[in-house]
Each structure stands twice: as structure tokens, then as C-alpha cells.
């Protein structure tokens, strides 16, 4: 009998014997970028773009699931952009009021704050 990915994982988690060992993967951000070639900033910030990418990778590699790493997802990130520059294929610069960010297919976003952040003492944190 052939199992669906869900049935396979549930069988294994219930200590039953599935048709094969469930296979999952947690991709690095760099690996996901290289495979999918998305807009780097959208992939980082837009939860729907990120989720669609994970589903695509799961199908492409015939995984039974993907272990999700969380990134900078923010539903209103576009509303806070001062400027958005496409530097070249796979490289983007986003400027927000307090910082600039460089997004690429090859690395995590690099963030540069315009003013040095104020570090709170432990007693100042709720």
C-alpha cells in the first residue's frame, strides 16, 4: 500500500510501520534562494511567498514535509518602505525610515541602521 505524505508521517509518529521512512528537510535560506530564485525581499518578508516556496520545494524534492524556519515575515512591510531598488538580478536594497537592508540570493539580509540602537538594561525590559 502506498501512503500519502501525511499518512506516512502519522504512521511513523504513531509507532506504526509506514511504506517507507518519512523524509523531511529544513532548507537553509541560501539553498531556498538558489532553488527558487524569488524576489529576495519578498521571500524574507511575505509569509505567503515564503509558504509557496516551501510547498514548491516539498513537491520538487518529493519530501513528506518541510521543517519550517521562520524569517522576517511582516504583513505590513511594504507600507513602511521609503525606497526599493533592484540593484541587479537577485540583489535588492530596501530603505526604511530607520535602516537600509540588502537582500540577495546568496545570504541572509544585511541590515544597516542609520542611528546606533539604544540597548536597554535588563531592568528596563517588561
Residue ranges and their predicted role:
Residues 1-126:
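Catalytic cores of TIM-barrel enzymes
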Amino acid at each position: 500500500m502506498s501512503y500519502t505524505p501525511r499518512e506516512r508521517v502519522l504512521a511513523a509518529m504513531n509507532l506504526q510501520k509506514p511504506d517507507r521512512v518519512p523524509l523531511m528537510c529544513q532548507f537553509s535560506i541560501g539553498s531556498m534562494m538558489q532553488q527558487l530564485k524569488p524576489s529576495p525581499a519578498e521571500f524574507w518578508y511575505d509569509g505567503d511567498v515564503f509558504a509557496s516556496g516551501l510547498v514548491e520545494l516539498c513537491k520538487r524534492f518529493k519530501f513528506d514535509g518541510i521543517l519550517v524556519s521562520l524569517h522576517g515575515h511582516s504583513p505590513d512591510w511594504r507600507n513602511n518602505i521609503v525606497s526599493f531598488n533592484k540593484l541587479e538580478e537577485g540583489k535588492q536594497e530596501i530603505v526604511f525610515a530607520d535602516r537600509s537592508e540588502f537582500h540577495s540570493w546568496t545570504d541572509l539580509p544585511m541590515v544597516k541602521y542609520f542611528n546606533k540602537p539604544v540597548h536597554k538594561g535588563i531592568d528596563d525590559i517588561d
